[in-house]
Amino acid sequence: MKSAVETLNPTRVRLTVEVPFEELKDSLDAAYKKINQQVTVKGFRKGKIPARVIDQRFGRGAVLEEAVNDALPKFYTDAVNEAELNPLGQPEVDITELKDGETLNFTAEVDIRPSIEIPDYSGIEVEVDAVEVTDEDVEKSVEQLRERFASTSPVERAAADGDVLTLDLQAKVDGEILEDGVADGVSYTIGSGELLDGIDEAVKGLEAGGEATFTSELKGGSAAGKEAEVTVKVSQVAARELPELDDDFAQLASEFDTLEELQADSRKRLANMKQYDQATQAQERVLDKLLELVEVPVPEKLLEDEINTRKHNLEHHQLGQMGLDLEKYLELQGKTAEEFETETREAAVKGIKTQFVLDELVKQEKLNVSQEELTEHLMRRAASSGMSPDQFAQAVVEQGQVPLLVGEVARGKALAAVVEKATVKDTNGEIVDLDDEEDEETEAAEADATEAADAEKADDKAEEKTEG
């Protein structure tokens, strides 16, 4: 076999392959064997029909077609390996010449990973938010905890802000009661904003047994997005009573003996959260700076696939669970269809570029992934998906996604290596030492790498089709 490569553009090549006919022998033998098992010829046992009889009865062309279909993937793969290409997706194959007994010639056009040069990135500088926990932050945190321990007691008076009501609801659209628009015994706190727009105004001033009707746009269910006439009946009004902020409350709501200890712990927890946010912010901003330094051409077909994947996931998974369609979602977001298309395309481009650049860094820095690192990443992914580590690991193995997880960890390490060499300052002008936030930094880096892995999954699916 002889092959040559023609570069069509930075992300696409054309392979020209010439195969001497004798190299088709194994595929021809397999073709005759396959046809032998599929046909019956009088006078011959099944599977024992001579090749010349098959040629006479069914045509040499049918045999050649079967042999070529069997041989093409192998010769294509050999040509790719010989040229040391990194193909993306399925090739477009064209058989240019097939002469029985002489030669098989074909071309294959395919997208490839572009060649990327990573420049010196040690001079990257970014600014992040300072980690500052104010007294107001601590007060708000403790107050939220206090709210969780509030008690309620029924009262015989008109409902007011902060009261907890027990409600019966009924929604009509075009005069018809919705099957999923009836709910009894619903608990609702006035001012929480957890139910329908307009409900606070409708129930304020009502006592137990009171009833009101108002119009509101439904947020979910079979008539999501439609205007409905909602009838609400108050069956109980209860006042909320907050516990006193003292040592007794600290003992009730935590493992601490004093309110001072509880407040100190809240301050520490808030600082840890802000440090994680700071590490995430540093990762994202360093990544943006890195992408600005590197010229990364993006294959158009890969980009189209990534855009379609993102749209599909949004419409059929996220919005589907919320009972929304894309049109209603854009309305709630205050975006036009054109703005959505632009944002989706930009996010897809960034995801693909991120994957290409970080993968190149993994090779350049010779980064490896240990079993311990992979296990830790798997456990984080399991927690974020709401699955047990064992369930998640089993699903990953069954779906053949272990290499994807390895890639996510490796890319996370590559990005962490770039951040380590970058200068990170907070808004106060102070140098941020991310070594003190190693765990947060690693998790943030792997989150970015996981986002970038969407494109790789699309690549792998396409490559599976090619190999098949």
From Swiss-Prot:
EC number: 5.2.1.8
Paired cysteines (S-S): none
Biological process (GO), any one: cell division
Protein task: Involved in protein export. Acts as a chaperone by maintaining the newly synthesized protein in an open conformation. Functions as a peptidyl-prolyl cis-trans isomerase.
Annotated gene: tig
GO molecular function, one term: protein folding chaperone
Pfam families: FKBP_C (PF00254), Trigger_C (PF05698), Trigger_N (PF05697)
UniProt cross-references to HAMAP family, sorted A to Z: Trigger_factor_Tig
Residue stretches making up the PPIase FKBP-type domain: 162-243
Main localization (coarse): cytoplasm
InterPro entries: PPIase_dom_sf, PPIase_FKBP_dom, Trig_fac, Trigger_fac_C, Trigger_fac_C_sf, Trigger_fac_ribosome-bd_bac, Trigger_fac_ribosome-bd_sf, Trigger_fact/SurA_dom_sf
One GO CC term on file: cytoplasm
Segments of this protein annotated with the region Disordered: 428-468
Family under the similarity heading: Belongs to the FKBP-type PPIase family. Tig subfamily.
Bias (Acidic residues) ranges: 432-453
Catalytic reaction(s) noted: [protein]-peptidylproline (omega=180) = [protein]-peptidylproline (omega=0)
Keywords: Cell cycle, Cell division, Chaperone, Cytoplasm, Isomerase, Rotamase
Biological source species: Streptomyces coelicolor (strain ATCC BAA-471 / A3(2) / M145)
Stretches with biased composition (Basic and acidic residues): 454-468
Keyword Cytoplasm: yes
Record-given protein name: Trigger factor
Matching Gene3D superfamilies: 3.10.50.40, Trigger factor ribosome-binding domain (3.30.70.1050), Trigger factor, C-terminal domain (1.10.3120.10)
Domain notes: Consists of 3 domains; the N-terminus binds the ribosome, the middle domain has PPIase activity, while the C-terminus has intrinsic chaperone activity on its own.
